[in-house]
């Protein structure tokens, strides 16, 4: 067994500036993750609902996300 070469010194304990209440950090993190997840689902669903309401006989849908442009249809763009 090894024996210590120096006697332990009594250093006054200072408060750790990087002390975290991990239960609170975990609770806040899970709450924010849940809120962002639900908002993402709502945004995805709302965009799909807008596209479904567009008139199917119309050539241009009402929402921009439903339009699909081909790279060859861009002005000045060449074909494939």
UniProtKB/Swiss-Prot annotation:
Chain ranges on the Extracellular side, renumbered to this chain? 1-22
State the UniProt keywords alphabetically: Cell membrane, Glycoprotein, Ion transport, Membrane, Phosphoprotein, Potassium, Potassium transport, Sodium, Sodium transport, Sodium/potassium transport, Transmembrane, Transmembrane helix, Transport
Glycosylation, residue list: 3, 5, 9
Modification type Phosphoserine: residues: 73
Organism's domain of life?
Eukaryota
One GO cellular component assignment for this chain's record is: plasma membrane
Transmembrane spans: 23-45
**GO BP: any one term:** potassium ion transport
In terms of Pfam families, this protein maps to: ATP1G1_PLM_MAT8 (PF02038)
Q: What is its main location?
A: membrane
Membrane topology term reads: Single-pass type I membrane protein
Which molecular-function annotation in GO is an example for this chain? ATPase binding
Q: What's the domain remark here?
A: The transmembrane domain is important for the interaction with NKA and with the functional effect of FXYD7.
Q: Which family does it belong to?
A: Belongs to the FXYD family.
Q: What does this protein do?
A: Associates with and regulates the activity of the sodium/potassium-transporting ATPase (NKA) which catalyzes the hydrolysis of ATP coupled with the exchange of Na(+) and K(+) ions across the plasma membrane. Reduces the apparent affinity for external K(+), an effect that depends on the presence of external Na(+) and voltage. Increases the apparent affinity for intracellular Na(+).
Protein's recorded name = FXYD domain-containing ion transport regulator 7
